[in-house]
């Protein structure tokens, strides 16, 4: 499975740097100088390998210099490009109750009472913590509920069973 670790937003300056929107929990490791990332153009075209020459944080994003990208035109041509890695390349997580986003996405969510809530569509990372965006369109009307990914609410996660069990506070599922 391919995981997106960054997206090129725009060129920065005239020397070929690009602004990258971060989509990984460890940008320092993913965008370390010397690393090679697969780049998928947004406008179609062949995938290519890009070698990171340098990366630095800038306003919540990264300014990245790639080997062979030496001017603004070359950098601007990368706008919208996604940097991806294969999930098989990710290291195993040794901490209990810690997951990669892609492991949670698609899992079914049920309450401790057995009520179906939906499936995890996305894991949102906010300043206040992680939220599970749980979507359900079983009754014909698409619905999304944001569930805080905290132990007080998420009582069990079973990757083997494809299930997350929650004990939501009153009103959470009614919002």
Swiss-Prot record:
Main localization of the protein described in the UniProt heading: cytoplasm
Domain PRC barrel: 96-172
Source domain of life: Bacteria
Protein's GO biological process: ribosomal small subunit biogenesis; rRNA processing
Annotated GO MF terms: ribosome binding
Keyword annotations from UniProtKB, A to Z: Chaperone, Cytoplasm, Ribosome biogenesis, rRNA processing
Disulphides: none
SUPFAM superfamilies tied to this protein: PRC-barrel domain, Translation proteins
Any one of the GO CC terms: ribosome
Subcellular locations according to the entry: Cytoplasm
Family, similarity comment: Belongs to the RimM family.
Domain comment in the entry: The PRC barrel domain binds ribosomal protein uS19.
Function, as annotated: An accessory protein needed during the final step in the assembly of 30S ribosomal subunit, possibly for assembly of the head region. Essential for efficient processing of 16S rRNA. May be needed both before and after RbfA during the maturation of 16S rRNA. It has affinity for free ribosomal 30S subunits but not for 70S ribosomes.
Oligomer status and interactors: Binds ribosomal protein uS19.
Protein's name according to its UniProt entry: Ribosome maturation factor RimM
